[in-house]
Amino acid sequence: MRKRLIALLFLLGCFCLVVYFRLDDNAPTEKQQPSWSLVYSGRSPLGALGAYKDGFAACNGKGDLIVFLTGKETMTYKISEYSFSAPPLEKDGIVYVGDENGIFHAFSPERGELWSYRTGNQIVGGAVIFEGLVWVGSHDHTLYAFEVESGKILHSVDCGAQVNAMPVLYEPNRTLFLGSCDGKLRRISLQDGTLLGEIDLESPIPENPVLHDGIVYTLSYQGVLVAVKASNFQEIYRVNTLSGCFAPPCIAGDYVFVTGENGTAQARKKANGELSETWELGERINTPCAVGDSTVYAVSGMGKLHRWSYHAEKWTHDVVADFQTDCRLGCHLFGHDLLIPDESGGILLYREANP
């Protein structure tokens, strides 16, 4: 009798589970499994992430370089007494990065610091390398070109105001493009540092220009979006978008995404800047990241991950994750995953549940 009672209770329990999963719309399914996780927990806020060999790296508020390589333990190196917010650049095993005291470092994990140079103010933007020179901007209003081997300054360019952005290379013409807080987009020779031209957007340019299919897209703080031919620096169009733009534009397929500090996002046609769609999100959106031509992600300051998907000639928007932590930096695409630094020094990984 006891065995029969146990069997009956077991069957009743199975029946209740079946009823629960069929009737409860919120019951967990494969598609609703958690798609994000905390992959690194640090004690100091991280700066922007940068690619490092087959992994990535970041510097933190304690002056450390932290390297994450696939299948290996996380490595930490002390490279400065000051905090970092700029992304590290790795080339041939050497890391180039500027700190918030204005010191630009060339560092080898095997050999230590190779050279450094103190600029006149903090460095918050990333560096680029071309033919043995590393270029980086500083808040002291200057773009520097250092020899990668020696740290010797070969060129310096007056940018009129502080530089927050990373330069963008256009190798076919051996030029670079850089925005500055004096509101001007500059075209500069990679051969000798000569200023080849400038376009005035009339308000500070807080972030990087974006180069896509031979066109340079630049966004000012007041929301002026300018598209320029990289080959000859001719302006294609100029449109007013949003005010309070701290993030760079983001290219996805035939569209340019812009976001404002007031929580507004726009999709505009890449060809002419014409407005396609607008979303009022109610929270500040950090730098967006495109995944292919049909998906854009952006994390908010409150830690919500927003997604825009293009289908049937229309963009749709949804919130795919709530990290429940503050975030001040944008998303970074690493393979098929998104990496998002949070305010506390952690790194969150988001992966589509059913790609």
Question: Language model features by range: what are they?
Answer:
Residues 4-15, 19-355:
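Extracytoplasmic/lumenal domain signature
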